[in-house]
Amino acid sequence: MKHKIVFVLLAGVLFFSCTSLNRQNSSKQETSGEADALGSQYFVYVTNRHKVPLLLPCDMDGSVETYQVMEGSYGNQHFSMLLYFFSDQNEMQLSLLNDFGTDMGSLSYDGREVRFESAMFPKNLKAEYIVCDIQNAYYDSAALEANYKNAGLSFESVRTLYETGESVEVRKIFEEKKLIEEIMLKNGREEQSITIKNYLRGYEYKLTKVED
């Protein structure tokens, strides 16, 4: 029961507060060659008026494979769970795990298709919104800036490197002067984490690396 409640809250945070548009479902069908030229076939509404396509995996900044604790909030509700995350320039994979390490849901993205499989969620949930948030944190900042600029939005990134070797990078998405989302990437000796705050949709979550 506990995990069912957590999944319902997670659904509210990442799916039900948003709507999306998939070009495959539009009246204009594209050939595979046209889709390659345009990039991802999935769009995400960052605001109620502006949508952006998902970037392709080749825009991933390096590669990462890690277990993370996900802690989040949506309104007055809070949740926490464990996840496994892998991403490189070919694909992205994410698995949601229970307290015993059992897979309770999985997401994958290879540039052509977003797949989300879980008995806990309806099949029509918008998994591309999870992909978009992950891209905002992990993908190349120049590629993100260009993508948002094409959608009429702005993307900023400021990285601070300390003498200790630790670093903090803050990424922000704006609609004109209105702050839509803020992503903080902390790479420290005691903590490696990503905090995502979406001011428009009213959700926040933090991903903290689990020590090996």
What spans do the regions from the language model cover?
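A short, Trp-centered hydrophobic/proline-enriched beta-strand micro-motif
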Residues: 52-74
